[in-house]
């Protein structure tokens, strides 16, 4: 009997040790092999080293400061940001234009956007997909982004400079919670992807969604409303 109790106790201790949270490592790589995420207990300003890179958890304010580099000199590259706590990414790309370089812009593909609800104007008038400003190898691949919480994508790619070069297959995005797609892809005049699989049942505004996209011949989203 005592032996059985000892076995049970040892088993319990073993399970407890296995389930103990590792508070020495605040960040981890998502199962997709790309996205860098923060653990549930992480707060703004938490830092940690993962695969040789020092990361910092940021929030809406830190990610959208126009004088970002002067306020946060410890963060020298975009790839050092862990964005799990960010909920609003409206027009942030414009703030990064002052950096004068897109050498590390590709690293935004590692950003965790799973809690973001607004991407309104995210890349509005951004040079970030234009090979005249960005080396082809530094253009970010946005197909890994988990946009399932986003409700506002209005103007997300509106008149991005070099918009002719934005033609990524974003058909796998979960846009089922988006209500506003006003001018989302307006001006991306080389975009040509099949977005007919998108669940746009909640969209209430898609006006001018695809204006000035002359090359777009593949199926577009099946909106439940008119997108004049």
Q: Locations of the language-model features?
A:
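N-terminal hydrophobic targeting signals that begin at the initiator methionine
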Residues: 1-2, 18
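Sec-dependent signal peptide recognition
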Residues: 2-8
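C-terminal motif of bacterial Sec signal peptides marking the signal peptidase cleavage site
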Residues: 13-16
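Negatively charged
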Residues: 18-228
């Amino acid at each position: 009997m005592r032996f059985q109790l000892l076995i049970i106790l040892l088993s319990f201790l073993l399970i407890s040790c296995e389930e103990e949270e590792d508070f020495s490592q605040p960040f981890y790589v998502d199962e997709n092999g790309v996205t860098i995420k923060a653990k549930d207990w992480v707060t703004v300003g938490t830092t940690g080293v993962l695969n040789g890179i020092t990361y910092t958890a940021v929030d809406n304010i830190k990610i959208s400061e126009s004088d970002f580099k002067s306020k946060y000199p410890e963060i020298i590259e975009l790839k050092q940001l862990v964005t799990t706590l960010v909920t609003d990414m409206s027009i942030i790309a414009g703030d990064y234009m002052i950096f004068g370089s897109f050498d590390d812009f590709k690293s935004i593909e590692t950003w965790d956007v799973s809690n973001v609800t607004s991407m309104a104007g995210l890349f509005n008038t951004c040079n970030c997909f234009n090979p005249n400003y960005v080396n082809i190898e530094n253009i970010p691949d946005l197909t890994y982004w988990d946009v399932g919480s986003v409700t506002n994508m209005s103007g997300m790619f509106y008149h991005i400079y070099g918009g002719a070069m934005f033609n990524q297959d974003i058909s796998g995005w979960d846009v089922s919670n988006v209500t506003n797609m006003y001018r989302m892809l307006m001006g991306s005049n080389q975009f040509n992807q099949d977005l007919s699989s998108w669940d746009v049942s909640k969209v209430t505004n898609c006006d001018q969604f695809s204006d000035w996209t002359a090359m777009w011949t593949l199926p577009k989203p099946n909106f439940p409303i008119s997108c004049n």
